[in-house]
Amino acid sequence: MTGQGQPAAGSAAWSTVFRHVRYENLVAGVSGGVLSNLALHPLDLVKIRFAVSDGLEVRPKYKGILHCLTTIWKVEGLRGLYQGVTPNVWGAGLSWGLYFFFYNAIKSYKTEGRAEQLEPLEYLVSAAEAGAMTLCITNPLWVTKTRLMLQYGGVVNPSQRQYKGMFDALVKIYKYEGVRGLYKGFVPGLFGTSHGALQFMAYELLKLEYNKHINRLPEAQLSTPEYISVAALSKIFAVAATYPYQVVRARLQDQHVSYGGVMDVIVKTWRKEGIGGFYKGIAPNLIRVTPACCITFVVYENVSHFLCGLREKKVS
């Protein structure tokens, strides 16, 4: 009897969650993710190249962010600065759209029937759940993006440049490495959901505390400068706490080196490069992700409020 009741209860819970989904969150998240990534993709390219720079001769040597950007521009041109942009835009748009979509549905489900706001831990868990669900769908796009970004222009061995584009990379990775190849970096990626969870928790709490401080309703809409400030602070906090996993994931997904797994990457990076190896690329990453986060959240908040306003007008 108990065994029959559990699936029924589980499906009832899921149907309750899906009752809270709103397409507005999906559309607004996609809009923010796409716009921010189109604007700042070259800095993401720099971050990836620094993250995997471990002394191999096959890789170009970069002295800093500007040197990296100018070298890529001279050798590969504008196209070089936008290597991997297609899967990045697809991945970022889909990731942000699904993240906001799942997160708001889970959050609405948890707040249904209660007057008080969620506790910090509840925000953290809700965002982690949304992140894990999103990663299950989008990980192949992130593997593809990394592979395309690591096709260096001017490389002597032409075999190092084996992908013609996003779909070619997806097909070849699946053909030669199977599903496992498309999900390389998935485990550190799951740990990476802690980044999004910490960011969303900080973002929600900062919004609530700020509105409380200036005597506004907890869910009151902020101005654009206020959204920018809150988003920037939450992003810097999350990056400082979780950056090393991004280096581990990038190295696992790199086609030039073969690692035995997450622990193999961690041990080898620590032995060869020390603690600094886990923070390679953090400067260009912070320069990129902070404004990217601000663009994403400002676009998301404004588009979602606009679309939700249209929904309310239709209902009334």
Curated annotation (Swiss-Prot):
Q: Which GO terms describe its molecular function?
A: FAD transmembrane transporter activity
Solcar repeat start-end pairs: 20-109, 118-209, 222-306
Presence of the UniProt keyword Transmembrane helix in the record: yes
In the record, the effect of residue 184 to A is given as: No significant effect on mitochondrial folate levels
* Documented effect of changing residue 209 to A: No significant effect on mitochondrial folate levelsa
The record lists the effect of residue 41 to A as: No significant effect on mitochondrial folate levels
Q: Name one GO cellular component term.
A: mitochondrion
Question: Where found, per UniProt?
Answer: Mitochondrion inner membrane
PROSITE patterns under this entry? SOLCAR
> What catalytic reaction does the record list?
FAD(in) = FAD(out)
Pfam families in UniProt: Mito_carr
**Phenotype when changing residue 114 to A:** No significant effect on mitochondrial folate levels
Q: Which GO terms describe its biological process?
A: folate import into mitochondrion; mitochondrial FAD transmembrane transport
Q: What is the effect of changing residue 249 to A/W?
A: Significant decrease in mitochondrial folate levels associated with deficient glycine cleavage system. No effect on its mitochondrial localization
Give the protein family. Answer: Belongs to the mitochondrial carrier (TC 2.A.29) family.
Q: What is this protein called?
A: Solute carrier family 25 member 32
Encoding gene, per UniProt annotation: SLC25A32
